Amino acid sequence: MITFIGYKFLTFLAYITPYPVTYFIARVGAILIYALGIHARVLKKNISLATGMEPECREVKKIVRDIYYQWFINVADFLKHPLVKADKFKKRIEITGVENLSNALKKNKGAVIFTAHLGNFEWGACRLAVEGFKVWGTGLTRKSVKTMLFFEKRRLLKGLKTLYVNKMMLNIFRILKNNEVIAIPADFDPLGTAKLHKFFGHDAFIPSGPVEIAMKSGAPLLPSFIWRKDKYNHVQVVEEPVDLIAETSDTPDRHEIINLNMQKMVSVMEKYISRHLEQWEMFHDIWSK
């Protein structure tokens, strides 16, 4: 209940302040959290392993500081989300490659989109929804039903439906059979069931869900990533489907095929994350050591 009340208060604050003031408050909050060192160790480790730089070097600290700011203004955008009309929303997110998703859906097997905790990834899924695609984004169940509905209703304002990760296998293939789209951040496994895969040259627990779902269902697996271009605007790209190695009846080792396809997915994530490290909002330790 306390968490829900906190979100409602922050929403009220976001509603009564113009964007420049809201972003200023977000910047102050980011500076405070950075000064307190909350999540700092994990963020430094993530950036260090992704770049090869020492965790305490000046450049890593600068990137971590920028991540805090990006995180806070993305939260501000989330709180103001109901105030942004669909036409304005489209203008704020410049998207390319929509035709790749349209063409993928011509197979009538749905589509699996993978992304990362990069930029305002929630808005990335919403941007596809306002284009007219039927999109489901994965989400976490929360202890407070009110808090859970708070997040869910905001997504629905732009047509994005929520698929809760602890219930997804019950519905996921039905969604794909209906030729709809599932969007999954693939750089973190909230269920803790992921196996180790090479990520930026290091062992990390990367979920194979997007790959395995695509392989089993026959749905195309497409990358889509979003990043902030300037203070108020974003760029989003939808790439062509990943050329997955198909599993056949005489496949000698299914796990080897999955691993090879995982390498393809991971390499795309690495490409976009490395280009926009200051927007990689990964607050979890995903590494084996």
Go through each PLM region and give its residues.
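Active-site metal-coordination segments of metallo-dependent hydrolases
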Residues: A40, T141-V145, D203-P207
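Soluble or luminal CAZymes and related metallo-dependent hydrolases
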Residues: I5, H39, I93, Y164, ...
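Non-catalytic C-terminal accessory region of glycerolipid acyltransferases
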Residues: M53, K62-R65, N103-K106, V130, ...
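Catalytic core of membrane glycerolipid acyltransferases/transacylases, capturing the structured
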Residues: K107-N166, D189-K195
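Hydrophobic alpha-helical segments typical of transmembrane helices
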Residues: F9, L43, G124, F150-F151, ...
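Short, flexible loop segments at the rims of nucleotide/cofactor-binding pockets, characterized by
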Residues: K88-I93, L140, L157-L163, F200-G201, ...
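Membrane-anchoring hydrophobic helices of lipid-metabolizing enzymes
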Residues: M1-T115, F151-K153
